[in-house]
Amino acid sequence: MNGMRVLISPLSWGFGHAGRMIPLAMELERRGCEVVFAADAPLTEMIVRELPGIKTVEIPGLRIRYSRYLPQYVSIFLQLPVIVASAVREHATLRRLAKELDPMVIISDNRFGFCHKKIFSVYVTHQVRIAFPAFLAFLEPLAAWMHRMIISRYDLCLVPDY
């Protein structure tokens, strides 16, 4: 693994995704890899605080808005167009970063568009099956199919807390 460049990009829906990538980055560095994080400004600040000297690249993040009044599944459903547009932007950003950084591996923590056909791409998720409230359970097969389509674009899917 000596000298292998690994590009890690956590989802920007809070600090949890970045937080679980930090131990992975530490282990990769311990094994001789060069780790580069691609994240939005708040996550980049946290990553640099936790891993001084780590290389980071600032990229746009997706800010999901949580409603005080609507159930969260409704709030997120209403933001689906923004989520899809964000995945398209992520993919374009990654194509540019791939040329600039030439990583051998890409690790995406729930970033739907952060994979590359020519670079070994890993998708990290804690939720393979997306659960819905009981009265919307009929939508679960559709959500599962959509998530499988996303995951199938990657070379490997890791479920760290399984």
Which ranges hold each PLM region?
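Conserved nucleotide-sugar phosphate-binding/catalytic loop shared by glycosyltransferases and other
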Residues: 2-5, 12, 30-80
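Active-site-proximal region of nucleotide-activated glycan assembly enzymes
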Residues: 117-162
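Conserved nucleotide-sugar donor-binding subdomain of glycosyltransferases
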Residues: 72-113
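Short, polar loop motifs at secondary-structure junctions
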Residues: 39-45, 106-113, 162
